[in-house]
Amino acid sequence: MRIGHGVDVHKLVKGEDLVLGGVQIPSDLGLKGHSDADVLIHAIMDAMLGSLALGDIGKHFPDDDPRYHQIDSKVLLKKTYQLITSYGYQLINLDSTIMAEKPKLAPYIDEMRITISDVLDLYPSQIGIKATTFEKLGFVGSGQGIMAQAVVLMERLY
């Protein structure tokens, strides 16, 4: 068994879409990034890569590579999981937290779980997603950005 932990942060700006867990969230502000800036999926990818000591998403999908400009993070998540399975591991459980002052994310959590489970070909019961605020403290609390953390448990298949 292997455990991995991942964290990602992106700045909120006008003129960008807000995509979290592969789901488009209605919002006046979106996340700025080279890809679609999906902090939740990026944290999950980093956790997966970290579980096998394979570096981080910047190593595998550099932000100066035009192939990844505005790419859907679900595509990168699929590629990351294919890499993990090529090493003989599978995801047993994933737990994650999105930290955002607004918008309220509770109405979208189930859709995120289903979206991620579809990409990874897992059961939604293997995907935990929670949302919380920073109680108006720091960059998240002031609405400057959104942060996500993820922890994964991997099991060797063979």
UniProtKB/Swiss-Prot annotation:
Its cofactor is a divalent metal cation. 4-CDP-2-C-methyl-D-erythritol 2-phosphate binds at residues 8-10, 34-35, 56-58, 61-65, 132-135, 139. GO terms for molecular function: 2-C-methyl-D-erythritol 2,4-cyclodiphosphate synthase activity; metal ion binding. Keywords: Isoprene biosynthesis, Lyase, Metal-binding. Binds 1 divalent metal cation per subunit. Pfam families: YgbB. CDD domains: MECDP_synthase. It catalyses: 4-CDP-2-C-methyl-D-erythritol 2-phosphate = 2-C-methyl-D-erythritol 2,4-cyclic diphosphate + CMP. A divalent metal cation binds at residues 8, 10, 42. Involved in the biosynthesis of isopentenyl diphosphate (IPP) and dimethylallyl diphosphate (DMAPP), two major building blocks of isoprenoid compounds. Catalyzes the conversion of 4-diphosphocytidyl-2-C-methyl-D-erythritol 2-phosphate (CDP-ME2P) to 2-C-methyl-D-erythritol 2,4-cyclodiphosphate (ME-CPP) with a corresponding release of cytidine 5-monophosphate (CMP). Homotrimer. HAMAP family: IspF. Belongs to the IspF family. This is 2-C-methyl-D-erythritol 2,4-cyclodiphosphate synthase. It comes from Natranaerobius thermophilus (strain ATCC BAA-1301 / DSM 18059 / JW/NM-WN-LF). The gene is ispF.
